[in-house]
């Protein structure tokens, strides 16, 4: 049986990357929240 997680850098960046986050209002809210919390890594 094939496992559900088939890692790929491209698809990961396209969905969870910084620029992908900045495209939407909700994504910008995520970045803002992570900045406020003091996260070292804002996105993948």
UniProtKB/Swiss-Prot annotation:
One of its GO terms (biological process) is translation. InterPro entries: Ribosomal_bL34, Ribosomal_bL34_CS. GO terms for molecular function: structural constituent of ribosome. Residues 1-27 are annotated as: Disordered. GO terms for cellular component: ribonucleoprotein complex; ribosome. Belongs to the bacterial ribosomal protein bL34 family. The keyword Ribonucleoprotein applies. It holds the Pfam family Ribosomal_L34. This is Large ribosomal subunit protein bL34. Residues 11-27 have a biased composition (Basic residues). HAMAP family: Ribosomal_bL34. Coiled coil: none annotated. Keywords: Ribonucleoprotein, Ribosomal protein.
């Amino acid at each position: 049986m094939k496992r559900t997680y088939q890692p790929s850098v491209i698809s990961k960046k396209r969905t969870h990357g910084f620029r992908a986050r900045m495209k939407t209002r909700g994504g910008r809210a995520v970045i803002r929240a992570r900045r406020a919390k003091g996260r070292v890594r804002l996105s993948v």
